Amino acid sequence: MTMSEFTLKTRLLAALEGKPVDKVPVCSVTQTGIVELMDEVGAAWPEAHTNPELMAKLAIANYELSGLEAVRLPYCLTVLVEAMGCQINMGTKNRQPSVIEHPYPKSLDGAAVPADLLQKGRIPAVLEAIKIVREKVGPDVPIIGGMEGPITVASDLVSVKSFMKWSIKKTDLFEQALDIATEAAIAYANAM
């Protein structure tokens, strides 16, 4: 591929692979939902966390209005853990959602990846928003699907305090929590 043949997507992929590019891609791999853009496009939190149309609209705003060379969504690290049973405070227009209750702080009795994981919580909204974004920006714009990794998922399921204690005193529970979290993260990532 010659330098002039790069699309936004092929340029980002080449840069991530350490290959030569015509210019450094400009994108955000963390969330991009800022209050000014929410106001500009009429897609604000917390509604844009649950409504796929608003989620897509806000995500595309940074590409269209700010010139970022990728679209990134969703806007928090609680989508997967909500589907796994964590209670979530959905935040406000200028505050991201956060975990307020952990389902397994004492033991992992009953802990497992739900068979219907991809139909739980906000996961369907995120997956639908990704489809909407792809339809609107076409195949040549990178879409960055943000999500929690296994350590974040595990520590949210059991609480950071238990997770840290288990890493030293109950390594079997620590490893089990990570196994469950890894399985869930892989399923969610593959669906994105």
Regions found by a protein language model. Give the residues of each.
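N-terminal basic, low-complexity leaders that serve as flexible interaction/assembly modules and, when applicable
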Residues: 2-92, 128, 132
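Short, flexible active-site loop motifs that bind/organize anionic cofactors or intermediates
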Residues: 1-2, 45, 116, 164
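Active-site-proximal, glycine-rich beta->alpha crossover segments in alpha/beta enzymes
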Residues: 85-191
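Short, intrinsically disordered, charge-balanced linker/junction segments flanking boundaries
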Residues: 1-2, 190-192
